[in-house]
């Protein structure tokens, strides 16, 4: 049996980022063989990551990066189980690594990015932190030529909301202001005509039921439905919204003044669409006490 020294444990900790006891145990089981200990820890990391994969990861961060010439940008979301881990330096380092990978490979989706080199670091982070970690999604906006337009981004100070926007005409300041507006107001689409037909149908049915309950004449009911639907479409369409920094003008008017047009936007909010598990703290404590 090899003697496991403090310097060996220290080296393994530095190479893996894992805790002292995990490293000491791995070296003991590997009979002091550093490389075998690392290999065993990597295998254990994969098993641990697989076991935790079913746990809901709905916290985390969003990050963006824009090319120097402004013709390309990327936004990603990386999830953890708790907000505490989302502020951990190791988690943030992995998120930055994922961002750089997504920026470098302009065609890769999440699966391709993981297969290309992120899955190993992800599993190692799961092993180190003890939570499920996911690269959830990635999106990119670009122009073939920088003269065609600009791509800009805005990330809210808490790193929970990020917006990527592509603009023809205007400048970076305008693009960033509109991205900030999108982060705050959360429009569904750019233009009224972009609202999906199924959404319009659903809203129309709701307004119809509400209006008919009023007992008003049919012609009045139809006008009520039409008016409410127009109002809804305006509220969810970016161009028709009052500009958040100057509510006296609409976003479309701001763009017209600058001779600019919005091509596309992407808005990510951490955890949106993920069904979070409801924790019963009292029941959890009771279970631990009875166990």
Residue ranges and their predicted role:
Residues 2-291:
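N-terminal assembly/interaction segments in proteins that build large macromolecular machines
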């Amino acid at each position: 049996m090899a003697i496991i020294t403090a310097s060996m444990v220290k080296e393994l900790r530095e190479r893996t980022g894992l805790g002292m006891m995990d490293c000491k145990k791995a070296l003991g089981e590997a009979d002091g063989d550093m490389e075998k200990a690392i290999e065993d820890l990597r295998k254990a990391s994969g098993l641990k990551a697989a076991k935790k994969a079913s746990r809901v990861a709905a916290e985390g961060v969003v990050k963006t990066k824009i090319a120097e010439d402004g013709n390309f940008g990327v936004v990603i979301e990386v999830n953890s189980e708790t907000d505490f881990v989302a502020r951990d330096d190791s988690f943030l380092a992995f998120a930055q690594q994922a961002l750089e990978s997504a920026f470098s490979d302009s065609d890769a989706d999440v699966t391709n990015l993981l297969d290309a080199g992120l899955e190993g670091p992800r599993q190692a982070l799961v092993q180190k932190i003890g939570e499920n970690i996911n690269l959830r999604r990635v999106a990119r906006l670009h122009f073939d030529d920088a003269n065609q337009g600009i791509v800009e981004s805005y990330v809210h100070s808490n790193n929970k909301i990020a917006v990527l926007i592509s603009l023809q005409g205007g400048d970076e300041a305008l693009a960033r202001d509109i991205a900030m507006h999108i982060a705050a107001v959360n429009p569904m689409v750019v233009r009224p005509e972009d609202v999906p037909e199924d959404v319009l149908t659903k809203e129309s049915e709701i307004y119809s039921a509400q209006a008919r309950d009023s007992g008003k004449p049919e012609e009045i009911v139809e006008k009520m439905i039409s008016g409410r639907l127009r109002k809804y479409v305006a509220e969810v369409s970016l161009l028709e919204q009052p500009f958040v920094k100057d509510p006296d003008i609409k976003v479309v008017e701001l763009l017209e003044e600058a001779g600019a047009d919005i091509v596309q936007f992407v808005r990510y909010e951490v955890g949106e669409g993920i069904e979070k598990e409801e924790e019963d703290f009292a029941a959890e404590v009771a279970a631990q006490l009875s166990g």
